[in-house]
Amino acid sequence: MKNKVLENLLDESSIQQQVPFSAGMRFPHLKVPANACDCHHHIYDRRFPVDPNSKLRPPDATVADYRLLQKRLGTVRNVVVQPSTYGVDNSGLIEALNQFDFATTRGVAVVNTSVTDAELKKMDIAGVRAIRFNLSQPGGATSMEMVEPLAERIKAFGWHIQIVANAEQIVTGADIWNRVPVPVVIDHLGHVLSVTHPSFGIIVRLLKRGKGWVKLSGAYIRSKVGPPYSDRTVVAKAYVKEAPDQLVWGSDWPHPTAKIDDKPDDALLLDLLAEWAPDEAIRNRILVNNPSRLYGF
């Protein structure tokens, strides 16, 4: 019996050590509720063609690799986000969704105005529930000008738009976010560096109307102080205080903007949620109820 217990402990330790693109080996201190959802991660697969204009070219980060992360974090549901690496070729995303279970997985695609209704329908069947606009990279596959026409196209599917943009672009696009006929999900805390920045007020007003959502993700991306990212905690706590029912959490694994030898610790990133949202009932909404509403689990 003792040998069996030791064997199980060794198995758990090896799982932690084998999670690629994630620093650290421990399990999170935060025990997540049943059906907890990681609402933002990517899959990279060299079998699929890259966009020649893309800037990020990370190594393969597969479905099998991600499942190891799920074991470490305790999350069950997940949302696969099309990376900028592949532009508007969503074949890798669809392949990844097919490898996951539809009951627990949804996807976010990247398209431009040339996408056909048949292609959108195929994505919908596969589990796609949103399209993403990466406005932070000039010359990328999408642009601000595409947001409104494509939002009109996806309205019939009940999808939303997802925006990754810097704080200034959030301000520039304020009228667009208010006009589009679908929900607006803002990545990575909106890249807001201070609650006094005008972008924070714009986002909070969207949240309070029920029109906007924020992903509590990517704390490491804009942090100037490093782990445990106390400078991002101020902004995250402010979102939780203002609109807890319009927030979801995401790991951003495999952390494509971080250097290969400087990946964040995903256990720490999850544990931050306990600091950002000390109330367990609110955390459970962020991890379970809110993703269920947004992605249709």
Residue ranges of predicted features:
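Mid-to-C-terminal alpha-helical segments outside catalytic/metal-binding sites
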Residues: M1-N35, P59-R77, P244-Q246, I260-F297
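Hydrophobic faces of well-ordered beta-strands that scaffold small-molecule active sites
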Residues: A36-H41, N78-V81, T105-A109, R129-F133, ...
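Conserved, mostly hydrophobic/aromatic
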Residues: H40, Q70, L93, M123, ...
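Catalytic pocket-lining loop regions of alpha/beta-barrel enzymes
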Residues: L9-I15, M144-W249
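Short, electropositive alpha-helical surface patch
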Residues: N90-V108, Y239-A243, D265-A274
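Divalent metal-dependent hydrolysis catalytic cores, especially in the metallo-beta-lactamase
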Residues: D51-Y86, T104-V110, V128-S136, W159-I161
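Active-site beta-loop-alpha junctions enriched in small/polar residues
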Residues: H42, P83-S84, V110-S114, N134-P138, ...
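Short, acidic/polar
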Residues: D60-L69, S114-M123, S143-V147, P198-S199
